A protein has these predicted regions:
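N-terminal Rossmann-like NAD(P)+-binding domain of SDR-like oxidoreductases, especially those catalyzing
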Residues: 1-95
């Protein structure tokens, strides 16, 4: 039986973190991305107790090669794009 592999773009946000928890609870292998996985503390993933169960990677969605690279590495069966700036103020400052 083929294992379900999920890739979540925007895993550090509220929706991405809760989706990751749901998928883990349902037997998925979960991978997540952030613009800079080295510097992000993923506080909500820690709070939910799932950070250590997820493989985290740095990906810049505006860089085609970065996206293709992660897709080729992980070969996900499902992809979720929950990335984006949720702060209205910051969305004008950093579109």
């Amino acid at each position: 039986m083929k294992r379900n592999i999920a890739l979540i773009f925007g895993i550090s946000g509220q929706d991405g973190a809760y989706l990751a928890r749901f998928l883990l609870e349902n037997g998925y292998e979960v991978f997540g991305t952030s613009r800079d996985a080295e510097l992000n503390d993923f506080s909500l993933l820690k709070e939910l107790g799932i950070k250590e169960k997820i493989s985290l990677h740095s990906v810049t969605l505006s860089d085609f090669r970065s996206v293709i690279s992660i897709l080729n590495l992980i070969k996900p069966t499902e992809i979720y794009n929950l990335s984006g700036q949720s702060s209205v103020y910051l969305s004008f400052q950093q579109p």
